[in-house]
Amino acid sequence: VGYVPVRGDCLEGTVNFVSNEVRELPADGRDRLDALFRSDPLMSRLDAELLSWSPGLATVRAKIQAAHTNFIGGGHGGIVFSLGDIAMSFASNGYGRQALATQIDISYHRGVLPGDLVIATASEISRTRRFGHHRVEMKVNERLVASATGTTYRTDEWHFGAEFWPDDWRGKY
């Protein structure tokens, strides 16, 4: 809660601030991004659900199914990783600027089983003009099963085109 100052882009020498407060997206940006996120093919393939999102924050969930298990019968770590990656992609793209994961480090703390409902929450730690850094937690029944940190590259491209987003929004985010 509150603001965390981060060093700005080296080329611009600016300072950006990351807030945990909900940001109001311009015009119908929220509805269009929501539809875009909900159309994610991998999320659909995993029968995952987007629970909530705002710029810099997102939560998704999925029940571990028999098809999500590894050869010893436990939930496959790749499914848990994918849920975290999906949450991070929505959090980082929630400003409207296209962002791509460049790195994710994950630690598995306990296994998951078929029937477990995994909830993955990604939150922004810091953001500059070019990079976003995120923390991701995957939980079952409020117990941490995996945690990750990741970096995203923030491109110059905007979802729905730059002209869709007001100048002040593009300048700030």
Model-derived segments and spans:
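Terminal targeting signals and extreme-terminal segments of soluble enzymes
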Residues: 2-173
